[in-house]
Amino acid sequence: MEKQGEVRQVPVPQAEPRPEDVSTIEGILKASYETISGGVGVPRQWGRDRTLFAPSVRYISILKDKTGGIVKARTYDYQEYLNESDDFLVRQGFTEVELGRKIERFGNVATVLSSYEGKVQSTGKVVTRGVNIFSLYFDGKRWWIQTMLWDEETQQNPIPAELLPKK
């Protein structure tokens, strides 16, 4: 039983990487959205998800105070991110979809700007939109996500048109 204030350790099952998930940039991005998405009460695919990220991955969330003025970066390692997000994702039936992307690649490294929309099945409402920035590297055999940085859309900070679906 967890004590008051303790964070639950989310278990991560061992899994082998799927070739279709890690052989291309497009594949790894598709998989990253699939693994965190699911219905209310449906466990997330954390074993599969873990195979996408480098052992030393960092997640960085950009946070604004209630007035929208002060901006801070919150950094998580892999387990911290799961521990903080799993309950919400499962309880609310969170689903995140990619809206558009821009890939910049040089040799074995790539940066991807990927716009997203997050919806909760419990209410059917869109609860977040923004841009994920993925830093990836290719080790000669497969792609790895090294960092994932994101910022949410606001009225003052809309998603750029080039990262939205064409009308």
Q: Where do the PLM segments sit?
A:
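A short, polar/proline- and glycine-enriched secondary-structure boundary/capping micro-motif
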Residues: 70-73, 122-126, 154-162
